[in-house]
Amino acid sequence: MALIEDALYKRIKNRVGRAIAEYGLIEDGDRIAVGVSGGKDSYTLLHMLDTLRRRAPVRYEVVAINIDSGYPGFRADIIEEHLHENGFTVHMEKTDHYGIIKEKRRLDSSYCSICARLKRGALYALAQQHNCNKLALGHHMDDFIETLLLNQFFVGALKAMAPGMLADNGLTTVIRPLVYVSEEDIIQFSRNNRFPVVCCCCPVCGSADQQRRRMKELLKELEKENPYIKKSLLRALANVQPRHLLDKRLKS
């Protein structure tokens, strides 16, 4: 399919390109696994990386990978069909994460956190299996900001996400090229291009992450007073002033 090359397309492409350049996310010879969940974010990321690849000053490969967590009703076939139709190299993996979560999860533990850890490990393994040195994930600007607030409000830590970092396995570099792209733009871009969005079919999807939903609501309220609040919060992540913080480890 040919993407609709309107002003929105150009804005997203420019912001992805800016993130890649500023943080050195892609280098010559990279083989990048893109985690494609079937959601709007990962489709946008995949198509943008492929678009930029065609005119990039460096040569890199893009490989689409998907982890089926085993939730009943998940339509992996729809994702696979879209990827093949658009000429992507595709690797799909079926797991029984759903069964593992049902068996191992404690009543007081988060369903989402266990699922995320299992899926992350599977993505790392699949990327390594197919000789990919980098794993691209579809976290966008709103995810960075919401994570910053969640960690401050509920964890007591001043942290969010990194646009690029070495994974815990010490082998795979995780990159997040959508750091400058808003969720609002991604929603519209996905609609414009009619991406076949697939629900993960998790039994608690849409109800479990109440804290993140509250952060979205809070930001929406604050935007009424300050339309630039998201840009300001994102800018704060790149403007850390250690002398004005309390962490003794930062003192020279």
Swiss-Prot record:
It comes from the Bacteria. Its EC number is 2.8.1.-. Keywords: 4Fe-4S, ATP-binding, Cytoplasm, Iron, Iron-sulfur, Magnesium, Metal-binding, Nucleotide-binding, RNA-binding, Transferase, tRNA processing, tRNA-binding. InterPro entries: Rossmann-like_a/b/a_fold, TilS/TtcA_N, tRNA_Cyd_32_2_STrfase, tRNA_thiolation_TtcA_Ctu1. Its main location: cytoplasm. It holds the Pfam family ATP_bind_3. Pathway: tRNA modification. A motif (PP-loop motif) lies at residues 37-42. It catalyses: cytidine(32) in tRNA + S-sulfanyl-L-cysteinyl-[cysteine desulfurase] + AH2 + ATP = 2-thiocytidine(32) in tRNA + L-cysteinyl-[cysteine desulfurase] + A + AMP + diphosphate + H(+). One of its GO terms (cellular component) is cytoplasm. Binds 1 [4Fe-4S] cluster per subunit. The cluster is chelated by three Cys residues, the fourth Fe has a free coordination site that may bind a sulfur atom transferred from the persulfide of IscS. Its cofactor is Mg(2+); [4Fe-4S] cluster. The thiolation reaction likely consists of two steps: a first activation step by ATP to form an adenylated intermediate of the target base of tRNA, and a second nucleophilic substitution step of the sulfur (S) atom supplied by the hydrosulfide attached to the Fe-S cluster. PANTHER family: AMINOTRAN_5 DOMAIN-CONTAINING PROTEIN, SULFURTRANSFERASE-RELATED. Belongs to the TtcA family. Catalyzes the ATP-dependent 2-thiolation of cytidine in position 32 of tRNA, to form 2-thiocytidine (s(2)C32). The sulfur atoms are provided by the cysteine/cysteine desulfurase (IscS) system. This is tRNA-cytidine(32) 2-sulfurtransferase. It comes from Geotalea daltonii (strain DSM 22248 / JCM 15807 / FRC-32) (Geobacter daltonii).
